[in-house]
Amino acid sequence: MNRLRFTKGHGTENDFVLLFDEHGELELSPERVRYLCDRRAGIGADGVIRAVRARHLEAGAGFSPETWFMDYWNSDGSLSEMCGNGVRVFAAFLEHEAGERLDRGLTIGTRGGERTVTALGDGRYAVGMGRYRLGDADAGFDAQVAVRGLSTARPALSVDVGNPHHVVALATEDELAGLDLTVAPHV
């Protein structure tokens, strides 16, 4: 692999390899992303985020050409619409690398649509996540979620905010406290 200038960033215990590629010259592939995210052979991260102007990506076609686009890849090499923690890290990266001012907000492009990020000071950022999309809300649920600490899988409703989530209703806070969330739930 050739030399690659990168920044490592993290937000709420998710870490990312960030690449500044304003002119869209960097070739990313699933294999390269998996290598970069590999914690033994590569840099190690939950994902790769490339900062690129929208005009240089097919996915950026619906945005103003000068819009910064968050080209987000999961650690398995798959493309993702966006990541809530990643978009805040991306904003800090744009302040540092591109000199962007976010105190009045900056609209960025993602595969999940536009997101507006505003710097709050002290390294904190607010993100307008856009509209959510529900799964089969009329049915009340559309998935089953199994998690350590529950004796049986529970019904869940899919909620998409640019990346998928599943919401499970629990009877009490004690029930929540009894879950082992160090292991990903099975959907």
Regions found by a protein language model. Give the residues of each.
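Internal active-site segments that recognize and position negatively charged phosphoryl groups
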Residues: 143-177
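Alpha/beta catalytic cores of group-transfer enzymes, especially the acyltransferase/condensing modules
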Residues: 122, 132, 139
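Short coil/turn motifs at secondary-structure junctions
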Residues: 75, 132-134
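A glycine-rich beta-to-alpha transition motif near the start of alpha/beta enzyme domains, typified by
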Residues: 1-121, 167-187
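Short glycine-rich anion-binding loops that position phosphate/pyrophosphate groups of nucleotides
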Residues: 12, 132, 164
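Intrinsically disordered, low-complexity regions enriched in acidic/Ser/Thr/Pro/Gln residues
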Residues: 127-129, 136
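Glycine-centered structural positions embedded in regular secondary structure
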Residues: 47, 130, 156-158, 184-185
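Flexible, glycine/proline-enriched loop segments at strand-loop-helix junctions
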Residues: 80, 130-132
